[in-house]
Swiss-Prot record:
Organism in which the protein naturally occurs: Methanobrevibacter smithii (strain ATCC 35061 / DSM 861 / OCM 144 / PS)
Protein name according to UniProt: Elongation factor 1-alpha
GO CC annotation terms, alphabetical: cytoplasm
Region listing for G1, in residue ranges: 14-21
Ranges where the record places region G2: 60-64
Gene3D superfamilies, sorted: P-loop containing nucleotide triphosphate hydrolases (3.40.50.300), Translation factors (2.40.30.10)
Binding site for GTP: 14-21, 81-85, 136-139
EC numbers: 3.6.5.3
Amino acid sequence: MAKTKEHINLAFIGHVDHGKSTLVGHLLLKAGAIAEQQLDDGENKFRFVMDKLGEERERGVTIDLAHQKFSTKKYDYTVVDCPGHRDFVKNMITGASQADAGVLVVAADDGVMPQTKEHVFLSKTLGINQLIVAINKIDLVDYDEAKFNELKDEVSALIKTVGFNPADVPFIPVSAFEGDNIKDASPNTSWYKGDTLMQALDNLAAPEKPVSLPLRIPIQDVYSITGVGTVPVGRVETGVMKKGENVIFEPAGASGEVKSIEMHHETFETAEPGDNIGFNVRGVGKNDIRRGDVAGHVDDAPAVAKEFDAQIVVLQHPGVITVGYTPVFHCHTSQVACTFLELTAKLDPATGQVAEENPDFLKTGNAAFVKVKPTKPMVIENAKKIPQMGRFAIRDMGQTVAAGLCIDVTPAK
């Protein structure tokens, strides 16, 4: 079967109890991607679709990223249902960096929460340039237009601060549970004349596929499949991989010929950016590669950094960041502790101009140029050359302390 429609990866972001999973579940139902009988009865029937993992069902929280597909007349979508609880922000980071567009879910009865702000900021830093805002649970505020407008103003102000133009962002009153304005216009919001959620999704611009950039596939998992062998799984970020080509995994160093490529249980001869694939490489075993490795062509291998220069924004740090600080950097699918070697310059966050050379410390709200050294080999690349491989978030003490972009790499070899 040929791949015909263009494909969009969609991240659902927002505060934990604002109804992301329920909205995704109802969207999948309306789009015909799941049957009614797959749903539980009662309050949480739509969320169940996304929360397949047993542990999640017990806790009632979405933990891992659930890749779900649905289609409209225009596009094929893969939903990256991004977890909302604070300790899962790092999942969101690896999730959001895989998304072409974001749906920000804000509950009408609860409004903008601190986490809402953090998710908006991170998604912009991690490369989401298209946004749809779903004002959810509109049924709980009696479909009140004034309440919707109040929230629209509040969220507009928030997204403007990180560089979205509110005029380009659809704001949609929805009820994830009742189904208002998901597929069809709801009679309960006769005051609303804009698109439904599915119409707004079809108005997104398909991402231009970075096919001319070098091949990069960050590995999410490695499986052993009977009759096939070792199957690394990941999303093609850039470039094109064809069956029969030789690829190398860095920093592991393992290489071999691509024997097969599979996506959603179908085999393909090639894989392009945006494709979530499993593939098999001759001579590469399960113990040779792991999550966080990156596959590329042998003649243009992913860069392993000895150290790198970066531009960061400190989002929230209870103290100060100084030389020697060693938090965990989350870049594509890798998580590696990196040490701050030098604080090169503090920047004016409004203009990006240097405000102070070699500052003694950085604190919440500061933007800066820094030099860091990974404590073990990791792939990270200049964000100007390969943006998908140059974005990262910095985590410490169970929270995201900073986010940034790699601007130069000193290669390890």
